[in-house]
């Protein structure tokens, strides 16, 4: 609803309107609103050090399209995360093999990567993100940026992201990714594709003296404390 009533969306909808002449009603099409990738993530850390990192998903748009009677929630279509046939990609372009084939009593491969990093056996970094197959990359790079490159949680979350998943043979980068790095990669014959955003990473970090919670600026995410 927020998008539907926003000035930017309304201006886009009116961009082909000409008040000087009659239009053809058949030319009026539905608007396009960028939907999320159907995955949600949240982190919790309390004063006693109890930590929770939860990623939950419908997988595709509206999951399998079935609503649980009397409960009002949709069932997912995580079956797509199985390999229907070796070498055939799923809806996220991930190519599966025989090891991930559909079989009774088997759990499908999933990209969901809710993570809790311990320091001296105590929760230190609580992190996760939605984003389909890009999830492991975003979680990994965020952790590495904090631990190895000494970035603050906010810097690590909002730093331009990239992703590569073996197949398709492409490196996805956000539009604000370092152009020098892109040029260097292209010079080595890597194929680069730009995306408006990759993931929406959430982080809570407890350094012993202070707890920091960071919500990704890429979406309408939020962080709060008590």
Map each language-model feature to its residues:
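Active-site rim segments in enzyme catalytic domains, especially the processed small/beta chain
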Residues: 51-119, 149, 153
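Short Gly/Pro-enriched turn/cap motifs at secondary-structure boundaries
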Residues: 31-35, 100-108, 193-196
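Extended C-terminal subregions enriched in glycine
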Residues: 85, 106, 139, 148-196
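Internal maturation/activation junctions in enzymes
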Residues: 1-58, 70-71, 78, 86-89, ...
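Extended hydrophobic
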Residues: 46, 117-118, 124
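Short glycine-rich loop/turn motifs
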Residues: 37-42, 51, 110-115, 200-201
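Alpha-helical support elements that line or immediately flank enzyme active sites
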Residues: 129-151
């Amino acid at each position: 609803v927020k998008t539907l009533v926003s000035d930017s969306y309304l201006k886009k909808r009116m961009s082909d309107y000409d008040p000087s002449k009659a239009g053809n009603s058949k030319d009026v099409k539905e608007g396009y609103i960028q939907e999320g990738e159907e995955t949600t993530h949240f982190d919790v850390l309390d004063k006693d050090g109890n930590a929770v990192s939860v990623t939950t998903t419908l997988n595709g748009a509206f999951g399998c399209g079935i609503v649980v009677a009397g409960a009002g929630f949709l069932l997912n279509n995580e079956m797509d995360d199985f390999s229907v046939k070796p070498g055939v990609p799923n809806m996220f372009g991930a190519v599966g093999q025989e090891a991930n084939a559909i079989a009774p009593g088997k759990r499908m491969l999933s990209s969901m990567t809710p993570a809790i990093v311990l320091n001296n056996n105590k929760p230190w970094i609580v992190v996760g993100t939605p984003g389909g197959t890009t999830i492991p990359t975003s979680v990994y790079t965020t952790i590495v940026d904090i631990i190895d490159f000494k970035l603050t949680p906010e810097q690590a979350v909002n730093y331009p992201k990239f992703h590569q998943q073996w197949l398709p043979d492409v490196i996805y980068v956000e539009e604000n990714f370092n152009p020098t790095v892109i040029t260097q990669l292209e010079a080595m014959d890597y194929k680069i594709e730009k995306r408006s955003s990759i993931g929406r990473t959430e982080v809570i970090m407890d350094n012993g003296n202070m707890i920091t919670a960071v919500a990704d600026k890429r979406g309408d995410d939020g962080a709060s404390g008590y």
